[in-house]
């Protein structure tokens, strides 16, 4: 299959000892740490926060060493038939049908405005959190701070996300510790990271809040806006079946399945038979769906 949308990043695991270098700090007061003090100073210098305000925040953070253990679990790559069995179950399909029927007016209105199909919006919410039934129960201040300062491998990324989280709490005029999400800091039904929330979340009903936890209009519009701003083309094919003979070069492209660095024309020149209605200029990636063991 040539697929014209990118997939979510899969982060490979690293040896446990790399993440435990800073585990010694868990349990100590965050405000005694030089890196936390440096973060506070930099955040204050950029404006919008006072040092006392941030010291109160870090003084109330509960570090979560179990999050480090979760992040250290070896990553797995599952074939499509296993993913489908686990994530597209009969019960989830029923939940999706109910979610869509209960909210059809607002979802279809969002779809019309953004040009993103209603079924795609519904499917994304279902895969991410099973329609809000699994949004995570960690206080985001706790999870993001733990990862920002006790997970060296991705400290830079999570410090940026922590900074984004602090800003969005101000923007939403909410207590920083009322936000709940996943162990990795993802939020709401669509599981947006704080930076994605600030950039792509939408206040659909104009109530002054971008509530991606409870407000289906905000959820649907945020998903649709994210897709549109990332290049969704209304009416364009998302995936098409192709025929090919595997060569070492094509196998390398299959292995790099999340890299959207080639066009349909590139694949045609490598011998991939793509349906004629797909233009050569379209960016695409080659993806193999294993529908059964060995098939």
Question: What name fits each language-model region?
Answer:
Residues 2-111:
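An acidic, Gly/Ser/Thr/Pro-rich helix-cap/linker signature
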Residues 48-49, 116, 202, 232:
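Helix N-cap/coil-helix junction residues
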Residues 78-222:
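Acidic/His-rich structured neighborhood in mature extracellular/periplasmic domains
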Residues 59-62, 126-129, 243-244:
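Short amphipathic alpha-helical surface patches that mediate protein-protein
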Residues 176-294:
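Flexible, glycine-rich surface segments
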Residues 71-77, 140-144, 256-259:
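Short, structured secondary-structure boundary patches
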Residues 40, 166, 224-227:
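Non-transmembrane alpha-helical segments in soluble domains
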């Amino acid at each position: 299959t040539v697929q014209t949308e990118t997939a979510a990043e899969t982060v490979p695991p690293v040896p446990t000892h790399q993440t435990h270098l800073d585990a010694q700090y868990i349990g100590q007061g965050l405000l005694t740490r030089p890196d936390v003090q440096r973060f506070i100073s930099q955040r204050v210098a950029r404006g919008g926060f006072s040092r006392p305000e941030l010291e109160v925040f870090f003084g109330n953070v509960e570090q979560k060493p179990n999050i480090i253990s979760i992040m250290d679990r070896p990553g797995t790559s599952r074939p499509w038939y296993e993913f489908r069995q686990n994530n597209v179950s009969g019960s989830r399909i029923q939940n999706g049908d109910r979610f869509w029927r209960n909210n059809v007016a607002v979802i279809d209105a969002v779809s019309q405005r953004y040009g993103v199909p209603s079924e795609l919006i519904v499917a994304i919410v279902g895969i991410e959190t099973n329609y809000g039934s699994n949004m995570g129960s960690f206080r985001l201040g706790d999870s993001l701070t733990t990862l920002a300062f006790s997970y060296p491998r991705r400290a830079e990324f999570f410090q940026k996300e922590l900074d984004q989280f602090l800003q969005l709490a101000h923007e939403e005029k909410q207590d920083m510790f009322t936000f709940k999400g996943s162990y990795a800091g993802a939020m709401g039904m669509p599981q947006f990271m704080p930076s994605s929330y600030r950039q792509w979340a939408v206040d659909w009903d104009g109530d002054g809040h971008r509530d991606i936890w409870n407000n289906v209009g905000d959820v649907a519009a945020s998903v649709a806006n994210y897709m549109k701003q990332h290049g969704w083309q209304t009416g364009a094919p998302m995936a098409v079946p192709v025929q090919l003979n595997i060569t070492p070069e094509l196998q390398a492209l299959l292995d790099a399945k999340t890299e959207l660095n080639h066009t349909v024309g590139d694949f045609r020149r490598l011998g991939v038979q793509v349906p004629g209605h797909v233009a050569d200029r379209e960016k695409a990636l080659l993806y193999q769906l294993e529908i059964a063991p060995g098939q």
